[in-house]
Amino acid sequence: MKAPPPPSPVAKRARVSPFVFLLVLFLLLFSFLYGEDLKELLGSQAQARPSLHFNAAAAGDGIELPAATAATTEGRTTTRRWRGRLPFAANGDGEEEEEECDVFSGRWVRDEAARPLYREADCPYIPAQLACEAHGRPETAYQRWRWQPRGCALPAFDAAAMLDRLRGKRVMFVGDSLGRGQFTSLVCLLLAAVPDPAARSFATSPDQQRSVFTAAAYNATVEFYWAPFLLQSNADNAAVHRISDRMVRRGSIGHHGRHWEGADVIVFNTYLWWCTGLQFRILEDGPFDAGGNSSTTTWVSTEEAYAMAFREMLQWAREHMDFATTRVFFTSMSPTHGKSQDWGGGEPGGNCYGETEMIGDAAYWGSDSRRGVMRAIGEVLDGDGADVPVTFLNVTQLSLYRKDAHTSVYKKQWTPPTPEQLADPKTYADCVHWCLPGLQDTWNELLYTKLFYP
């Protein structure tokens, strides 16, 4: 039988109804507007986010600035999925389950009633470098913001409950001065459970390498250990470390790591000290201070050097931590606000000095925050570090908005400002560190959440 002839192109076109075009147009528009919601509904997101088992809450009353999204971070937004039981978890068996809420995506909400969580005058352990009120900051609006995740609420920070769950345990912060600030913030938050000075102690080693807060009734300690690169470096002196030609020794994680052994919860951080240029020097062999050819060094990209240190940190955790009983956290890079042109500031050469409001652009990303470092972390965690249950505290985006929260000029100045500097305060403003109480208390609310409600 002869096959019927194929339809002509004219016949084909005649069969296409105008409603088809309308349907296609509708589907494209629907996909554009609601594509992300569909992906969440169908569970097709490639990157897992954490689940929280406390009740969702409304955003609350007050000013809301701004709404951060995972898309603005270009890096890991949360902890990688871990199928084993997470120690210290208070929600069920502590295993990662279905996605419910990304606590790092949300907005800042003004909260006059409940903020700050403590007063500067009530925490005797705040160092002079972070005590902004004591050094003349005239307003405290920066203390009165609460982080509101999209779709849920952070659990209320309960100092007594935290210490009770950490009874007989050691919590250790390891890193640079930003890590020390987070450590100090947590100590201040915990004082609500140990108001009696006789029931607590705080000590710093003579070399300032280590500080330890002890809550005697709980037999619990919160500690800080200075290691700005995590690896052995030529900036390891906690008191004298203003070195421009910085370098780290390859394979040296154990140099500092021997002091971390036995900790039950470790919170690592390292970032700012790596930012000396596009390349970084690695000491392969020999002493740091050797001249001539007695030492062997190599230059690599800053991202490669950073990834090397991150891999060594993960390897140390594999060898020295029992993931059935201990937890590992990593606090993402803390942003700086040294260039007001980044956020459209009007004054040439301006910075965080005089800033009392946060940045309102949800997509804001400062020029000093290196996306390549965030990518390097993600690549290591998804590659060599896939077997290590490290919880990534992604505080970068929510902190990027907070140009108002830096210590600026309201801190102890170790070198008195010159008359020229006093005439132009922005020239000596600290746009790296954060006032306490303030932003870093939110970092610890997120730590509290991810420790007990992962």
From Swiss-Prot:
Glycosylation site residues: N219, N293, N394
Keyword GTP-binding among UniProt keywords: no
Motif (GDS motif): 175-177
S-S bonds: C101-C152, C123-C188, C132-C435, C352-C431
Keyword Transmembrane included in the entry's annotation: yes
Topology of the protein relative to the lipid bilayer: Single-pass type II membrane protein
Protein EC: 2.3.1.-
Function: Probable xylan acetyltransferase required for 2-O- and 3-O-monoacetylation of xylosyl residues in xylan. Possesses extremely low activity in vitro.
Name listed for the protein in its UniProt record: Probable xylan O-acetyltransferase 9
Organism annotation: Oryza sativa subsp. japonica (Rice)
